[in-house]
Amino acid sequence: DLSASGARRIRLSEPLRCERFSLCGGSCPLDFAPLLDGVFRMDLSRLNSGTLLPLAECRQLMTLDLTDADISRAAVDEYLIRLVTHHYGRRNCDLTLPVVPSGTYAEPVRDAVGACVPATGLEAVWLLTHEESWNEGGAWVIRTPEKCYRYTPNQP
């Protein structure tokens, strides 16, 4: 837990074995996050950061709390779309977002080869909560200030 450290930048020269990581409040870029080896729970509530993309490399992450974080809607959308487009080897995750992603919660348009390509954050949320193979080990849960989206298996 580095919340009380007042860290404005974190530099890691090699992977750091860590199951839980907290950096609440303050302002700090997240470019160190891919070097947190084995992290499955991260609390970044009230953090100010320009991008969430480094978190997309944390494929073992199962809980991410961004409650009241100062993160733009565009940065949240970019992160959610990256989760979908780079999904291979990723665990399901319980995400708490600071803002409602852009767009409409609906299946995205398919490309020429039939793959869904999300254009907005809520289209990415739809895919994360509807793709059966991505929810086999556990359900994706995405909480926004207005609504909670979760995978629900199809009933026979």
Predicted regions and their residues:
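Extracytoplasmic/secreted proteins, especially bacterial periplasmic and envelope-associated proteins
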Residues: 75-78, 123
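Concave beta-strand-loop units of leucine-rich repeat
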Residues: 1-9, 16-30, 36-75, 84, ...
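Residues within well-ordered alpha-helices
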Residues: 121-127
